[in-house]
Amino acid sequence: MTIAAENLTANHPRRKWTDYFTFCVDHKVIGIQYLVTSFLFFFIGGSFAEAMRTELATPSPDFVQPEMYNQLMTLHGTIMIFLWIVPAGAAFANYLIPLMVGTEDMAFPRLNAVAFWLTPPGGILLISSFFVGAPQAGWTSYPPLSLLSGKWGEELWILSLLLVGTSSILGAINFVTTILKMRIKDMDLHSMPLFCWAMLATSSLILLSTPVLASALILLSFDLIAGTSFFNPVGGGDPVVYQHLFWFYSHPAVYIMILPFFGVISEVIPVHARKPIFGYRAIAYSSLAISFLGLIVWAHHMFTSGTPGWLRMFFMATTMLIAVPTGIKIFSWCGTLWGGKIQLNSAMLFAFGFLSSFMIGGLTGVMVASVPFDIHVHDTYFVVGHFHYVLFGGSAFALFSGVYHWFPKMTGRMVNEPLGRLHFILTFIGMNLTFMPMHELGLMGMNRRIALYDVEFQPLNVLSTIGAYVLAASTIPFVINVFWSLFKGEKAARNPWRALTLEWQTASPPIIENFEEEPVLWCGPYDFGIDTELMDDEETVQTLIADAAGS
């Protein structure tokens, strides 16, 4: 049900389309720039995945040669992590945080623009490595393998990640400062939206872990270019040191990729279930707990790397412990759904897809956290299936949920719901068909990252490839929906979902200054069910806001 609210944008100047191609400091423009750029890289990285799955439909190299397969595999992983999911989280944070806390812009607008404009050059550098021999050592780039493949392709990979990592650090500084220092006067930490809590936890992880990755990459670059031996065993270096440095960032990176979308789900579910969030403080504090525990679990990636037994036990325990705050979130979301007036629109369908898929990824995560089990499935397709259920079934489903939820606010247009539902159905079927067989392949002993495999693995690989084609097809209704809705969609009201957070108090899309006057907290961000009949009347809502401002 929509509310016929005045579209304030009509009375104010709007951003021109050319602003989205310039060094604009408006956080909303930067948020859209991040979102569009991340999806462009999603299509590039996804096309690499389709090429890989086409090759894996047969045991022998029929479609691409093993060297090209290794390059595609390396760039696919790097793009999907560093140029799709991470920037997509930054897109929502840039667009929403100032609106949610009731301020005009980020704390450091120019720094915010610099952060974005480091990302496209990073992506261009990475893809241009094809012209000099793309890296073949995987997205982890372990030495000595990374020291033996194409030197200049590997160097471009390093420079790309340094640019994107710098972008993440600059963005995190902005997010933390804006959340802590620029909230409106009536908003304390426990009355701000849970998305802001999620970004506070994410930004803390970025600031603590990304410099460690940068140091590892710089040392690896010296080994490549200057002939040093920090990680080269031929000269007395230790490759395991690189693994520790790399995973000290790259396991927290999993939470950097999922925590923003935990925040998205915490916004979507109460709005479309018409019910207060269950356990606000539990969800908020569990984000901080995940952020802390995420820094002390990295060596579970190294159970087979000569890690001492006592250290294995420590990291197994901390890895299993991190399931506790994650489980708190799952139970809180399910508690919010229980007894709610659920609206099965596109945003909510993807939220349901997130819940079911992420729980599968979480359960398999507890399995691989166990040392005896991990030793047997390490570097097999079981691990590939696990992390794709976490990152695609988790982050990507929540990303699409957020796109459908905030599309009216960002564009001033409603999405086409039948196309959105078709997008969800194809994505859900394709995702499970692609990644579920990988668990069985891993248990059967199929190694990851290799183009050649035994013929006994072919039936499940064919099934997985069919699923990948369904996933590719699922993007068609999504793209059609976005462009059709932009130009032909029904005009959106200021608050079509009858939500309570501050971004819905301004026009759709928001005016350049965000708000005509300082917004007012007239209720909590999730006070659904309290005089809910009032929410059906926009005039009554505005009266309540005015009364709150007067008091």
Curated annotation (Swiss-Prot):
Tell me the keywords, alphabetical order.
Cell membrane, Copper, Electron transport, Heme, Iron, Membrane, Metal-binding, Respiratory chain, Translocase, Transmembrane, Transmembrane helix, Transport
| Listed name of the protein | Cytochrome c oxidase subunit 1
Q: Which NCBIfam families match?
A: CtaD_CoxA (TIGR02891)
PROSITE patterns in alphabetical order: COX1 (PS50855), COX1_CUB (PS00077)
Cross-link position per record: 1'-histidyl-3'-tyrosine (His-Tyr): 251-255
Q: Does the keyword Metal-binding apply?
A: yes
Similarity field: Belongs to the heme-copper respiratory oxidase family.
Q: What is its main location?
A: membrane
Its placement in the membrane is given as: Multi-pass membrane protein
Which residues are listed for heme a3 binding in this entry? 386
> What does the record's cofactor remark say about binding?
Binds 1 copper B ion per subunit. Binds 2 heme groups per subunit.
- Residues where Fe(II)-heme a binds: 76, 388
Q: What does this protein do?
A: Cytochrome c oxidase is the component of the respiratory chain that catalyzes the reduction of oxygen to water. Subunits 1-3 form the functional core of the enzyme complex. CO I is the catalytic subunit of the enzyme. Electrons originating in cytochrome c are transferred via the copper A center of subunit 2 and heme A of subunit 1 to the bimetallic center formed by heme A3 and copper B.
Report which reactions are catalysed by this protein: 4 Fe(II)-[cytochrome c] + O2 + 8 H(+)(in) = 4 Fe(III)-[cytochrome c] + 2 H2O + 4 H(+)(out)
